[in-house]
Amino acid sequence: MKFTLSWLLEYLETNASLEEITDKLTHIGLEVEDVIDNSRLTGFIVAEVLEVVPHPNADKLKLCKVDDGSKILQIVCGANNVREGMKTVLASLGSTLPESDFTIKPTKIRGVLSEGMLCSASELALVQEESEGIIELSDDYKVGDKFFNCDPVIDINVTPNRGDCLGIYGIARDLAATGIGTLKTLSIPQLTSSINSPIDVEVTDGESFISGIYIANVKNQESPKWLKDRLESIGMRSISAIVDITNYIMISFSRPMHAYDAKKIEGELTVRKANDGEKFAGLNGKEYLLNKDISVIAGDKNIHGIAGIIGGKCSECTLETTDIFLESAWFDPISITKSSRQLGISTDASYRFARSVDPEFTFDGLNLAAKMILDLCGGETSSVVSAGSLDSADTKVSFDYQDVNKFGSVSVSPDEVLDILTKLGFSIDKKTEGNWNVQVPSWRPDVTIPADLIEEVTRIYGYDKIKEEPLPNNVEEVDSTYDNLRILMTNRGFHEVLTWSFMSESTAEKFGYSNKLFIIDNPFNNSFNIMRPSIMPNLLQVTADNIAHGISDLAIFEIGPIYDGEAQSKYVLSGIRSGNNLPRNHYNTDRKVDVFDAKADCIAALEFFNVNCDNLTIEKAEKEHYHPGKSGTLSFKNKVAGYFGELHPNILDLFDIKQKVVGFEVILENIENLPVSRKKFIDYKYQSVKRDFAFIVNKDVEVGNIINVIKKSSELITEVLIFDVYHGNNIEPNKMSIALSVTFCSPIHTLTEKEIQKESSAIVNLVCENTGGTLRTYR
């Protein structure tokens, strides 16, 4: 957003310097990107040549008497086109040429003193190629005036929520709220109509508002110098007085407008949706193919504009235009954004409409522009015609001013809070001492909650005044806990991955998450249109990508948030194994991962938090993405701690995975709430001993029961792991062989072989008694 200092001062009463103003702009969030200070161009003056005589000592030079508006100067000039009575540009003494950085000084040229220089266009960097002769100005230029607009130009970066600051008046309002100056009161003219508008308006797209004034008998012409200078200084091309006035109002008040040549409009103007395949010729000389999602402004025969984006060539205002229809409208920001992207058109108008313009300034902007047109071009006006409904939200926010200091970490008095909000245009009803009812102004649709008001006050009060506050200690504790959990998983052979927090709705539904999905209103990609309800689909995609690159043995995990339909996130640990597991010994190097690996990983994570897994029950997994017969849910009294199991073949098919994959999920936020006893830490100083058992049991025996029986058989047992489940030769069809590794250790002495044998016999007896099984091997 560019504007000149003098333009700003039309709306802001202040004695602040340029540097003070730009510093304050950056401090309140309107970051200054550039300041173009043209003060070095003040020495270039409009001058008139009064007399031209030959140089006494040079045939190709001339001696000129030049009037600069204050005195008569003697100038030596070599231009062929210099003549008496012409107006040109004088580089006065002390000025520096922009093209060469040459400073003008009193100089004797062939023995005659020259008190300045008459300039060509190339010497002033107005053209790239070298020009012949000096600049010849029209009679409109006044002798003594500065040739260049030397007004400093300020360029600020406006955030998307501040559409009001895409107008200079909005910027002035923010500056006034800081105390740097006073916002000048805006006087809105009241026009008297003398004719009826032959053009009526209508809205059928269901989302727009349009108003307009018919102005007859205008004399469109070149804009006056002050208006041209204003627009050209910020990079806008002057076109004609009528068009320039609409641009002037847009830059001043963030109020886009459009002027139609009224004689080129047939019937009424209707804001409607385009038909698929309709064509439109824009003012930029390009033709566009439209569709039914784009709002247009059309007459009976032609489309005269794409709503809020660009006008049509068919009703363009020219210097021959005598009657105009001046439009001021409001269009839906989302609709404008989508249409602009579809068509690949970005204009000053669409940029503002997409960020929302003030709906309540629609008529005020129309009157201001119409009054300027009457002043500069003459004419007579109709009354205002309008159609549609204005989307002017009546937003009120309940606000406790004490929250500014509480959450903003500043010290602002209630009177200061009231003063800042009032200067920003908010109106306050003091309901109680602490609770205010704040009416949000129509130009601030981004302010909807108390936090927005806190931001507004702290922004104007000064972000540099915010006190430093230490972070809560619990943040460090949580981070440290998760870091240690990551170390545990790494020690178990896993690699950590980080995946998107988004996924597609269709993928979630295939995993059984059809309810309570958190839909993203404006996703950057249709494949990422919901917040993920599970990390497992993302891990499977990573697994599939690795398998496609030849990496089939994989163990990956992620710690991160998942989301339900109310946008409540909870942290989980999810992991996946596929392919070969780490070999148990050098005789068994190609063991495939199985459900017990996933169970062991899940239990290891729970035991990391000192959960006594002996008290957890194992039930059938309720998640649809697990194999129903090879999975489980770890819980205690309906409080889920985690899930584990082999991934369902149908799920693997979605990712084109042809090998077995197992996974687990630990609900980290449930762990601290699990009503289970905590394991007491025992420092085992003495050597542990392992023994392996293999039992033949019926296939319907739950493996978890065998583990629980073994763990309860002795206090010397520290770990029980399953490392093999076998069906096949030498085993009856309804039987299976379960192989387990049991670790013994005493906290007070090294175990003897006799003690180990006694504990092992107790294990065999209890397992056979509780399962009806038999011992197959022991070693």
From Swiss-Prot:
A GO molecular function annotation here is:
phenylalanine-tRNA ligase activity
Primary location = cytoplasm
The UniProt entry, under InterPro entries, shows: aa-tRNA-synth_II/BPL/LPL (IPR045864), B3/B4_tRNA-bd (IPR005146), DNA-bd_dom_put_sf (IPR009061), Fdx_antiC-bd (IPR005121), Fdx_antiC-bd_sf (IPR036690), NA-bd_OB-fold (IPR012340), Phe-tRNA-ligase_IIc_bsu (IPR045060), Phe-tRNA-ligase_IIc_bsu_bact (IPR004532)
> What is its cofactor?
Mg(2+)
Co-factor: note: Binds 2 magnesium ions per tetramer.
- Has keyword Acyltransferase? no
- Chain positions recorded as Mg(2+) binding sites: D446, D452, E455, E456
Q: What is its EC number?
A: 6.1.1.20
Please list the residue ranges annotated as the FDX-ACB domain: 684-776
Q: Which residues form the B5 domain?
A: 392-468
Instruction: Give the GO biological process terms.
Output: phenylalanyl-tRNA aminoacylation
Q: Give the subcellular location.
A: Cytoplasm
PROSITE patterns registered for this protein in UniProt: B5, FDX_ACB, TRBD
> Residues in domain tRNA-binding?
38-148
First-level EC class: ligase
Its cellular-component GO annotations read: phenylalanine-tRNA ligase complex
Catalyzes what? tRNA(Phe) + L-phenylalanine + ATP = L-phenylalanyl-tRNA(Phe) + AMP + diphosphate + H(+)
Q: Does the keyword Iron apply?
A: no
Which UniProt keywords are present, listed alphabetically? Answer: Aminoacyl-tRNA synthetase, ATP-binding, Cytoplasm, Ligase, Magnesium, Metal-binding, Nucleotide-binding, Protein biosynthesis, RNA-binding, tRNA-binding
Family stated for the protein in its record? Belongs to the phenylalanyl-tRNA synthetase beta subunit family. Type 1 subfamily.
Assembly description = Tetramer of two alpha and two beta subunits.
Q: Entry's NCBIfam families?
A: pheT_bact, YtpR
Q: What is this protein called?
A: Phenylalanine--tRNA ligase beta subunit
Q: Which organism is it from?
A: Wolbachia pipientis wMel
